[in-house]
């Protein structure tokens, strides 16, 4: 468990670093270029993610298969996956360039080549990270992921400062993927060998189901953005993406836990140790909402002030705060769904995840297509919330009986009570002195977080023990 705690802590630290650095750069970029330029990049990123779905399925298969002990070596798996991914990249790139007039009209941006470059470099880099996770080197993968985010942000900052414009956002992603990807390849403990048919079949047997879960993830994260691009301006798409990225902070902890526990749960699925899997899942669920619950409260009280940091192109739009609050609710549900779905994937139950994926994707498409034309960006948030809630219920019901666990009501209740105390403190301070300067936004958020943390530590002995255990195991 010590190794698992260290891996989770490092993954969480990497996610926090990447998110905060990215947020600072995003604030600068939007203030310089406007939220419309950021909306163009968000739509481009959505296209890249959707084009990457087949490759993501291969990457998931690599992580799972390299963790297994069978007659096929990790080197065979990774090499074969590299060849398959290369073929996917070629097809996707040809399609993207072949339909470039339509793509440029949709994006309102004449830079299809840069979109293609981001697609190629991102897919390749993510495969390398998958190889490291397949070797159960979560710490190394987390480190490279954080470095990727930092380098990408710094390149964007430098190029925007020198007047490159929206192209800078693409160059940042491409440069970082290439540079950090090269270091990642050299860190792999595998040799490149001839691809084998048996490895391809084994990868396919997992990916044919696993890709649908990835499609589900993409549907959750990017389908609303794609559909918004047909009905609203790039500025509104940019505002939606800003709110989505702010609320992303709330799911950093469950994301880190799920990534770190995946190899461990995967290694236990063929044994009689499913009770251990249940304990891992219960522990994860007890802390999954630690950031999302106070984050939701904070978005209601100071969400408008946080959005004001991004400049008038964001804060002047009346719907911006409502979008942030709505997406904060979505993120709260996602915290718990993430852990349960990752457990299903790690337990190698592709038939169950397949059914959940089909239902989620169908529901999400129908709701987005129905609600976005009527309610715009708010409709996208509502559609995502309803789809995620349904997916969470189905995921819990799909868990094997030996793994199913009751929700840790006491732990979650303590988090809500602590968030309530935080709300009282923040509301009192805001009534006494409303926020007037950007630095006050940071100070008020820190005051709220401190209040929440102290109250939670005093109320929840289990959370206090978890923190002490994590610090002990991570530092020891």
Swiss-Prot record:
Keyword Secreted applies: no
Name of one Pfam family that matches: Polysacc_synt_3
Subcellular location: Cell membrane
Main location: membrane
GO cellular component: plasma membrane
Disruption of the gene: reported phenotype: Mutants show accumulation of both tetrasaccharide- and mannose-linked dolichol phosphate. The final mannose residue of the N-linked glycan decorating the S-layer glycoprotein is not added.
Name of protein: Probable flippase AglR
Organism: Haloferax volcanii (strain ATCC 29605 / DSM 3757 / JCM 8879 / NBRC 14742 / NCIMB 2012 / VKM B-1768 / DS2)
Gene: aglR
């Amino acid at each position: 468990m010590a190794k698992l705690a260290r891996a989770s802590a490092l993954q969480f630290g990497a996610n926090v670093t990447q998110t905060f650095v990215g947020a600072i750069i995003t604030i600068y970029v939007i203030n310089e270029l406007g939220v419309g330029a950021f909306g163009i990049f968000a739509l481009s990123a959505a296209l890249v993610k959707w084009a990457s779905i087949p490759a993501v399925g291969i990457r998931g298969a690599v992580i799972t298969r390299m963790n297994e002990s069978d007659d096929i070596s990790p080197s065979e798996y990774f090499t074969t996956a590299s060849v398959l991914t290369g073929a996917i990249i070629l097809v996707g790139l040809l399609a993207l360039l072949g339909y470039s007039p339509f793509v440029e009209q949709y994006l309102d941006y004449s830079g299809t080549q840069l979109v293609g470059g981001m697609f190629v470099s991102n897919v390749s880099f993510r495969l390398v990270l998958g190889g490291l996770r397949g070797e159960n080197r979560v710490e190394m993968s987390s480190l490279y992921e954080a470095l990727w985010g930092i380098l990408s942000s710094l390149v964007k900052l430098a190029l925007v400062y020198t007047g490159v414009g929206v192209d800078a956002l693409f160059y940042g992603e491409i440069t970082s993927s290439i540079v950090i990807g090269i270091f990642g390849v050299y860190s792999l403990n595998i040799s490149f060998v001839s691809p084998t048919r048996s490895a391809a079949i084994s990868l396919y047997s997992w990916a044919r189901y696993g890709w649908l879960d990835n499609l589900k993830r993409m549907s959750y994260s990017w389908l609303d953005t794609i559909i918004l691009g047909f009905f609203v301006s790039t500025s509104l798409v940019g505002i939606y993406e800003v709110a989505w990225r702010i609320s992303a902070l709330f799911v950093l902890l469950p994301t880190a836990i799920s990534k770190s526990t995946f190899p461990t749960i995967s290694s236990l699925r063929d044994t009689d140790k499913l009770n251990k899997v249940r304990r891992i899942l219960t522990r994860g669920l007890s802390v999954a909402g630690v950031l999302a619950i106070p984050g939701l409260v904070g978005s209601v009280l100071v969400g408008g002030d946080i959005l004001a940091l991004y400049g008038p192109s964001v804060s002047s739009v009346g719907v911006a705060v409502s979008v942030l609050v709505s997406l904060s609710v979505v993120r709260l549900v996602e915290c718990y769904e993430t852990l349960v779905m990752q457990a299903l994937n790690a337990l190698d139950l592709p038939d169950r995840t397949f059914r959940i994926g089909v239902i989620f994707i169908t529901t999400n498409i129908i709701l987005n297509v129905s609600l976005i034309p009527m309610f715009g960006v708010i409709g996208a948030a509502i559609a995502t919330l309803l789809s995620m809630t349904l997916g969470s219920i189905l995921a819990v019901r799909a868990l094997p009986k030996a793994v199913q666990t009751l929700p840790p009501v006491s732990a979650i209740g303590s988090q809500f009570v602590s968030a309530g105390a935080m709300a009282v403190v923040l509301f009192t301070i805001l009534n006494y002195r409303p926020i007037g300067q950007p630095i006050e936004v940071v100070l008020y958020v820190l005051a709220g977080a401190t209040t929440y943390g102290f109250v939670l530590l005093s109320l929840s002995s289990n959370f206090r023990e978890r923190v002490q255990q994590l610090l002990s195991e991570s530092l020891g």
